[in-house]
């Protein structure tokens, strides 16, 4: 059963305790089963539905109701632009909105979610191979693509993470992340409903919200993106409030080493770092009982295999330095891109390995470090293959740098020249010399551009292609 903690036959008198806290609403496990089953009765039989995925109790019940009824859903960001929303609705072929609707509903009918309605009808568990949801990618390379995720893939990933993080029903999981991405929706919400722990959504991922969840509700497992953890680390009072926690988990973008170190110093916890994508879910992570090395995303999860290859497809040595293209495979892979068979075929090689599009290194112990995106983070300059992330890490260690992003700009002589975009007060010449001293001369930026802010998406990832085109 995908949502194992919501098995009606397993509910007991103790299930009157709160299972989910979100937007001021408190839902017990019994509330979740009764209200979500009522949603399932209204949505049952639909082909696909859209859910406006704001952090609300209605979203929780809509998602849960769809999974009970076996109806695939499309989580739609509440702040998405009209053109992108129209594409998602048209491409997915959804038949209705479930729950609240945006101002522009595109003429689709509306199925309400009633928080106080209850039904105790028993639904048969859908096939593990059935589609659970279609998550649209960020669209950095064109219109967003619909990633088709099966119930089997989600269950396999959550079980592997539970093993890696020693995640149990005794945990209290806290985050304030969006409910339209893998991080907040699949790991945070569905993970809690599968494992049976309490789930607290803070509305927004603020240091104060996380601290309050720790002190008032006994939060043990906190999820955040690097931007969140940077802000927590800048608020000493909030950071120290997380000392009783069990794990701080960072993902969706690389965690800067200075942020890792500051969190460890203030909270007493070295953050867990993990790696994944909408297409593969989470495939790599450091362990609750294992080594946590700043800048490294750990070992393959149970059932996952990885390899790093060069441009000719040959395996690169596991020496912790040689950069190559990261391929993964495992039971949590997506079923393909909706309506895009050519893109799906291109995503996998002839042997069934998923081409992540990221470049990485593996060391002798099997630990993985993500260098970045093959398209923007692997810089080929003067005959060298240079990872942008390595340079960014060094720049962030300079006291005059708050944020940094490194790209390779076209260059007639070098092929690509290294350009650093920096938020901070340090002079560019000083930063160039600093990198040359810390790494090597050929890895130094040829140019440093001081900017007020770096362009980022909703999950905090720097939009490097925008830097390349607009920079």
Identify the residue ranges that each predicted region occupies:
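Conserved AMP-binding/adenylation subdomain of ANL enzymes
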Residues: 155-172, 180-221, 235
């Amino acid at each position: 059963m995908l949502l194992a903690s919501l098995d009606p036959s397993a509910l007991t008198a103790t299930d009157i305790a709160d299972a989910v806290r979100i937007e001021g609403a408190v839902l017990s496990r019994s509330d979740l089963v009764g209200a979500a089953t009522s949603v399932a009765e209204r949505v049952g039989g639909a082909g696909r539905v859209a859910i406006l995925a704001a952090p609300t109790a209605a979203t929780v019940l809509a998602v849960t109701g769809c999974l009970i009824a076996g109806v695939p859903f499309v989580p739609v960001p509440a702040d998405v632009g009209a053109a992108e929303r129209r594409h998602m609705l048209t491409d997915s072929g959804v038949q209705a909105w479930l729950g609240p609707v945006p101002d522009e509903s595109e003429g689709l009918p509306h199925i309400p979610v009633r928080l106080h309605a209850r039904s105790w009808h028993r639904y048969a568990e859908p096939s593990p191979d059935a589609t659970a949801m279609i998550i649209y990618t960020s669209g950095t390379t064109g219109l967003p693509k619909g990633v088709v995720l099966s119930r089997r893939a989600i269950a396999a990933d959550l079980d592997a993470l539970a093993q890696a993080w020693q995640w149990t029903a005794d945990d209290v999981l806290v985050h304030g992340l969006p409910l339209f991405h893998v991080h907040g929706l699949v790991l945070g919400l569905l993970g809690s409903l599968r494992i049976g722990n309490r789930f607290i959504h803070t509305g927004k991922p603020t240091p104060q919200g996380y601290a309050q969840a720790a002190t008032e509700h006994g939060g043990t497992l906190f999820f955040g993106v690097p931007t969140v953890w940077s802000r927590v680390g800048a608020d000493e009072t909030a950071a120290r409030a997380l000392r009783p926690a069990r794990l701080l988990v960072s993902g969706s973008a690389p965690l800067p080493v200075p942020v890792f170190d500051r969190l460890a110093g203030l909270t007493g916890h070295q953050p867990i770092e993990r790696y994944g994508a909408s297409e593969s879910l989470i495939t790599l992570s450091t362990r609750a009982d294992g080594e946590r090395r700043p800048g490294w995303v750990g070992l393959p999860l149970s059932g996952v295999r990885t390899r790093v290859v060069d441009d000719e497809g040959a395996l690169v040595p596991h020496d912790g330095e040689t950069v190559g293209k990261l391929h993964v495979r495992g039971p949590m892979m997506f079923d393909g891109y909706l309506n895009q068979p050519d893109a799906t075929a291109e995503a996998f090689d002839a042997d069934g390995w998923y081409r992540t599009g990221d470049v990485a290194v593996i060391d002798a112990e099997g630990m993985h470090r993500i260098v970045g995106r093959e398209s923007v983070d692997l810089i080929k300059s003067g005959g060298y293959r240079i990872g942008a992330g390595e340079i960014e890490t060094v720049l962030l260690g300079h006291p005059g740098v708050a944020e940094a992003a490194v790209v390779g700009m076209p260059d007639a002589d070098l092929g690509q020249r290294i350009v650093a975009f920096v938020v901070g007060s340090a002079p560019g010449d000083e930063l160039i010399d600093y990198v040359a001293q810390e790494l090597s001369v050929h890895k130094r930026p040829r140019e440093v551009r001081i900017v007020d802010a770096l362009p980022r998406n909703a999950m905090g990832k720097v939009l490097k292609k925008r830097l390349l085109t607009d920079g």
